[in-house]
Amino acid sequence: MTILVLGINHKTASVALREKVAFSPEKRDLAFQQIAQSELAQSEVILSTCNRTEIYLHNKHISPEADQENQRWLEQCIQWFADVHQLDVDELRNCLYIKQNQSAVNHLMRVSCGLDSLVLGEPQILGQVKQAYQYSEDYCQAQHMPMSSEFSRLFQKTFSVAKRVRTETNIGNSAVSVAYAACSLARQIFEGLKDLNILLVGAGETIELVARHLLRHGVKKLMISNRTLARAELLVEKLEHNKYIQVLSLQQLQDGLNQADIVISSTGSPIVLITAEMVKQAQQKRRNAPMLIVDIAVPRDVDERVEKLDGVYHYTVDDLHSIIQRNLSEREKASKEAETIIDAEASDFFEWMKVHQFSNLIRTYRESAEQIRQDLLEKAVQAIGQNEDPETVLQELSYKLMNKLIHSPTQAMQAMMKQGSIQGLRSFSSALGIADKKERNPQK
């Protein structure tokens, strides 16, 4: 049996190619159908995000060794990957990474722990892996084709490893994105965010990320001010927290400042939007209560003179970048600890899989022998019931039982003799307990 990963990501492929190999739900279902029909694998999980597309396959019938059968199967998988997206196979191959067995297990765990992400240690990827696995599980159940126990165990093990890495290392403790750093800064300055008034200026991607972080931390009073009201309203719809969010025009920006404990601004404006005079007026109405202003726009949205006002804490994007750089260094240290955990866990899983593979073989062998015994015993009981001589029946039973049990091993030894496989014969003979007498009883 073998586990295979075929993938491209932000390190190996352009955005244009990543877009071409993305899997919509419809294309994912088509892929599952094609994989089953062509017998490329018995179980599969497809992970498709903006930064990566990875196909995890489990084939019980392909040897993990690098033999010709394995190579042919690998080429079939690559060709299918290209065909399903109508791509030239060479174009895909140039950007493709291929990992098998323990390397594949290790890769899945690294991906799920955020060690292979664009932002080191980011937690979102684990949720995306879980969704990909659940999608595959649901599809298998709908088709009455259960996912293989080995593959299911691999993903469950991966999820527990990711949890362990989060618990035992500091991989996710430090902010490494501008949006997250802004929110972390707010949580450091104010004990809690839930009862604060927060004003966001802008409605782009960064402000969306900031809003999501804030809402996740229980913020109940959020204002969004933007030059285009329609875009701000669209953002509110995407956030799905309408009752907590108020939309303001830029003409109402002063009203928002008058209420705000925290201001985070990120627009594309070529001019300053929040002047020192506007903040001074707001502070007079707020009686100089602490106000945090985080300007993450380039060019700047906020007049830098606001930092001289009483009660105002002013940070720019450069301040955040220095925080992020320090935090990245911390994550780099934590990632080394995470790698040690992953290497050990991946090795443990692969050892289990190898033993599990052969335990199935042993169980099948025992079941086969038991079936032979039951069949012959049933015939012997019937013969004795028909008044045949018990001694003759038992003699025949023992003779037939011996012949049936040694039939397959005898054929295997004959095949090895024809091939001249001396080492194979020695190993097989030793396993059967019939090593050459001279070897067992050497002359003194």
From Swiss-Prot:
Keywords: NADP, Oxidoreductase, Porphyrin biosynthesis. One of its GO terms (molecular function) is NADP binding. It is an enzyme of class 1 (oxidoreductase). The record marks 107 as: Important for activity. NADP(+) binds at residues 202-207. Belongs to the glutamyl-tRNA reductase family. This is Glutamyl-tRNA reductase. The lineage of its organism: Bacteria, Pseudomonadati, Pseudomonadota, Gammaproteobacteria, Pasteurellales. The gene is hemA.
